[in-house]
Amino acid sequence: MDKNTVVGFLLMALVLIGFSYYSSQQTSQQNVTTAPTNKNQPAHDIQATPTIQDVDTTDLFANHLKGRPNVITLQNNKVKVYVSTKGGVISKVELKEYKNQQKTNVVLFSEKTASIDFTLRGKDKLLHTQDYYFTPTQISDTSVTMQISDSKGKTAFRMKYSLKPDNYMVDFCISSNGIYPYLNPSTKTLGIQWKDRVAQQEKGFMFENQYSTLTYMEDGNETRKMSETETSEENAEKPVRWVAFKNQYFSAILIGYDMFTDAHFKSTQEAEGSGFLKDYTATMEIPFDPSGKKDITLQFYFGPNQYRLLQSMDKYSSDGSELGLENLVYLGWPIFKWINRYFTIYVFDWLSQLGLPMGIVLLLITILLHIIVYVPRKRSYISSAKMRVLKPKVDEIARKYPNQEDAMKRQQETMALYSMYGVSPMGGCLPMLVQMPIWIAMFNFVPNAIELRQQSFLWADDLSTYDDIISWSVNLPFIGNHISLFCLLFCATNLIYSLMTMRMQRETMSQEQAAQMKVMQWMMILMPVFFFFMFNKYSAGLNYYYFVSLLIGALCMWYLRKTTDDKKLLEKLEANYRANKNNPNRKVSGMAARLEALQKRQQEILEEQKRRNNK
């Protein structure tokens, strides 16, 4: 059988995250929003005003147990970060340059569905930052310090947030003073619990959920990700450098420069239609100096999963080290990752900078890839063509050895024939293997390219999700609630390509081989139907790439067939035959020699078995 089609077929199957008085005078200059209080509220009211009733007066920060939640807004040209006085933590993050399905800013983190809590071990109880109302100080458009202190102001716990200009990175520093006498003597770490119920941002739940996962990097730069499809829970085996709450195109990342320890992660699947993808929880410890001599240095990243952008975050790391955040963008197994990293991304970035529509960019990349593999494709076709013109001679050998017990002799003589004419039966297969890494690399690249998000092309209004040319309200098994036109075109082209391939196969096969291939041929015809149910929910960009790639492949096959002169090819093979026949010292080498040796060995084994059976 022709190995080209089998390899190509298997390929397509694969290819199946109060104010001081001074601040009250500066209120008009600060970016402070208060909810739900009056806008004209004096700034000094922002400080949590405790009431005697219901306040635990034994608490170290008892004067901060009561108050009103207020929000400080930090922003640059890319992101808006809301820091709440309740808990002193980030309560909401908006990305200014990206819109959701409702055409409003993407909200990557919201207090309605997410929380961050830091825990200290007191002498007789745990102190949770989420229980306190912090006082904001040192406020600017891009930074704020949240503080709680005892009634005398001698003991304090602070959290400072600094938003970098033109960046998605937030520097986060935790400091304290005079707190040591009030803590458990064994305290050496600060507890962290981060939760986030990640909202669905894209139109297609299945496709977005498939590329959303809790991911973390352990010491040694080893990135691990939890299951994308199942609820899972695990403990990190090593100290953790960073943890990311990731959906398909955006991530919220917490980076620790002293390494998180005792890290425990949980990812819970959400139901389709709930508006959420997964519920993430990260529970960790980080080294803490109770004496206050050393601060805790952390960073947040709230932004898109864009490979080059994540890679550039290394230069903004607090200690100047490599972060490896680009590992969040899955580019495939090592060989496919290498192709995407050093070829696909470079070409994609270059074409994108030309201002072309993303559909044209994908088309040009596909054409370029086909140009690269044209030479091995042509060699593959010529190898099949040689076998086609020699088919009458192969049929003669089949008639010479019609019995099944002569199958080995028939095969040996056929291989000898190919050898004399200078034809390699594997010539059509091996060159095709060169194409496999490229096709699979593109399969991994396209669904992770945020550049395709909300980019329209032809009838598709968003190449990052399905192009529903027809839709309905009921969610049907296997097909969902829509039909993707690019998926239909891909499957139709797949069928045409399969029929062309089968026709080429029949031209090189004997009658016996053709009979044996009937089941495989029916599978190839039914495969496009299987692909339709499999890829109908996939992104329009991916189906468009498959459609264009197969269409170009079919056109190349048609062109090669039209430009190949069987008569001249046979004359060339006859010349090879005469040259080899007149060269008694000719030696078979390479794959043909190995196949010949294997067949001789098989023949020896069969003859040995016959002798034993006759005894």
At which residue positions do the language-model features occur?
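Soluble non-transmembrane domains of integral membrane proteins
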Residues: 71-324
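Generic detector of short, locally flexible boundary/turn motifs and exposed helical patches
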Residues: 45-51, 56-60, 136-141, 259-266, ...
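Juxtamembrane extramembrane loops of integral membrane proteins
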Residues: 21-103, 146, 150-152, 588-615
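Helix-loop-helix
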Residues: 1-41, 83, 172-175, 186, ...
